[in-house]
Amino acid sequence: FEHIKIGRQDFFDKQIEEWEFEVKKWKEEGENGKKPKKPRPLSRPDVPNGDHEERKWNIPENWIWTQIGELCFVTKLAGFEYTDYVTYVEDGDLPVLKAENAQRNGFKITDFSKVHSESVKMLTRSQIFGGELLIVFVGNVGNVAMVPYNQRYFLGPNVGMARPYFKLDSKYLELFLQSGVGRSLLMSAAKATSQPSLSMGTIRQAPVAFPSLEEQRQIVQEIESRLSVCDKVEGSITESLEKA
């Protein structure tokens, strides 16, 4: 818990430093445009509800139960931000991520819409650098995908984003939330209507079974190793059927 607390504080301190730099730059340039907004203190998620508690299980002694909102900054592109600043252009240099990029089995590359990075640079919350999680909150609700590294993106409409506050294995979080038990925890607070949906608050509220960074990496390695074997078996079966 102390590690999480320190990580959250470091994240906020960095936000303040970046804001102070932007304010200084804004003043040096003659205070043109709006003054950069001061970051708000990091919010705490609502405590898990009864359904969450019922779905928890006994975890190893050195693990903890925490929540997405304790581990990650969770946000979405606001409606007014999309209306006022986002214009798709063919010659854009920044691909836009949407709900279609988060499938049940992870990130899917599509024919991305694009924007000019310069036109959306003020929307700092929606800048994506890799390692964040996409979480679909309408439509294919509950789909989770880790954004690949080494490519910048922009967060588009109808999909939430969870950015870790500190160093953790994002792949572990992705696999946990894609699992039957993890998805159940995420979806237990979804609005039960004909078309279920999640709010940013209910995403933050979802519990996560959280081990040490070393164990996260070991778990990811073990799962990916087994999935690799499954892929090979599936490929072999497909090849045999095609030859039959």
In which residue ranges do the predicted regions lie?
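Extended, domain-scale alpha-helical bundle/helix-rich regions
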Residues: 1-46
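Low-complexity, Lys/Gly-biased intrinsically disordered segments
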Residues: 24, 50, 64-105, 122-123, ...
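Non-catalytic DNA-recognition/assembly elements of restriction-modification systems
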Residues: 46-79, 205, 209, 213-221, ...
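Short, ligand-facing micro-motifs at secondary-structure edges
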Residues: 81-83, 103-114, 133-156, 170-175, ...
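Short alpha-helix capping/helix-loop boundary micro-motifs
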Residues: 114-123
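Short, well-ordered loop/turn sites that connect or cap secondary structure elements
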Residues: 127-129
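A short glycine-rich beta-alpha junction/loop motif
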Residues: 137-140, 152-160, 168-171, 191-213
